[in-house]
Design a protein with these regions (language model features):
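Acidic/His- and Gly-rich active-site-bordering loop/insert found
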Residues: 10-152, 171-176
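Short glycine/serine- and small hydrophobic-enriched flexible loop segments
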Residues: 20-23, 164-171, 269-273
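Acidic-enriched catalytic cores of C-N bond-cleaving enzymes acting on peptides and small amides
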Residues: 26-34, 202-205, 210, 218-228, ...
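Stable alpha-helical elements in mature extracytoplasmic
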Residues: 46-50, 71, 75, 158, ...
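Solvent-exposed loop/turn segments at secondary-structure junctions
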Residues: 60-61, 108-109, 120-123, 187-191, ...
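Short, solvent-exposed loop/turn segments at the edges of secondary structure
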Residues: 97, 111, 135, 177, ...
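Acidic/histidine-rich catalytic neighborhood of metal-dependent amide-processing enzymes
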Residues: 146-147, 151-233
Length: 308
């Protein structure tokens, strides 16, 4: 009887594996967009602007816990000097001195606007790790087809990309259908209030956007070699987080006569229970679709199996 059960389970497992392999083989790559995008060569001025942006040490907090206002003032002047058409055709509003909102009026004001966001502040370079930098962190060196420095990937690249795109489109006489708002914060790295200030500013004006695009992912080649093509990662949500503050209120004691259960014992137990009670893991619809699209486009069998 036991042998029959084992044999049946083995047959079912074999059929299940065959089904997975069949589905993996049958999976077709997700159809690419039919839209053709003609990308113009990146102008040298854009590269220089990115390099210059990195050279401005807009550290959101220093060792003295006070921002370097001179650097943030320099950033404002840099934007005005580098993007004259943006400042000529868009309305620039300073929010609490160092955050900015640019309004680009569209042809159809009845449409809900789009918001493009980014931040130009960067984290400090700790003295203990400064020597590990292969290029000075605020040099903006252009070497080996790369622009080096703090903020090159978080997030001056995003801010400069938005400004370069806007400047180039304005140069060609482009006017968007929807109104666009370009919003740049100055204290994201320290979870500062500038984003809330911008939201309050927009809410007071009755602005309800169609979409908000903030920072974004990366275009990766090294991490997706099996695909044989670059992968652009578009984030559609943000992970949640929660912080707990645990406190114990218990009478004191003495090491010569320790209590059976001290405040530290109780706190340790609470921390242990908290650590061993994580939220249940789950795959949301966007994650499932991401895995399916990537897996079906991969030559890697493991990826294709995951897509099934």
């Amino acid at each position: 009887m036991v042998k029959k059960i084992v044999r049946c389970l083995g047959i079912l497992l074999f059929l299940f594996i065959l089904l997975l392999l069949f589905n993996a083989y049958r999976a077709k790559p997700w159809p690419a967009s039919a839209a053709k995008i003609n990308l113009r060569p990146l102008p040298d001025s854009a590269i220089q602007h990115m390099s210059q942006a990195i050279q401005i040490p807009t550290i959101s907090i220093s060792d003295s816990a006070a921002p370097d206002t001179a650097a943030f003032q320099t950033w404002g002047a840099f934007m005005e000097r580098s993007y004259p058409l943006v400042h000529q055709h868009l309305t620039r509003t300073c929010i609490r001195r160092f955050s900015y909102v640019f309004e680009w009026k569209g042809q159809r004001p009845e449409l809900a606007p789009l918001i493009l966001m980014g931040h130009y502040d960067v984290v400090p370079v700790e003295a203990a790790v400064a020597a590990q930098w292969t290029r000075p962190p605020f040099s903006g060196d252009i070497t080996d087809s790369c622009i080096w420095g703090r903020g090159a990937v978080d997030d001056k690249n995003g801010v400069i990309s938005i400004l370069e795109a806007a400047e180039g489109l304005l140069r060609n006489g482009f006017v968007p259908q929807r109104t666009l708002y370009l919003c740049f914060g100055h204290d994201e790295e320290i979870r500062g209030p500038s984003t809330s200030w911008v939201v309050d500013y927009l809410r007071q004006r009755g602005i309800r956007p169609e979409m908000v695009l903030d920072e974004g992912g990366e275009v990766s080649e090294s991490k997706t070699k099996e695909l044989g093509r670059p992968l652009a990662v578009i984030g559609v949500a943000e992970k949640g987080h929660v912080s707990f503050e645990l406190s114990i209120n218990k009478e004191g004691g003495h090491s010569s006569l320790p209590a059976k259960e001290t405040a530290i014992d109780i706190l340790n137990t609470a921390l242990y229970r908290l650590k061993n009670s994580p939220p249940p893991a789950r795959l949301t619809a966007p994650v499932k679709e991401f895995i399916g699209r990537i897996g079906s486009s991969s030559d890697n069998l493991g990826h294709r199996l995951a897509a099934t």
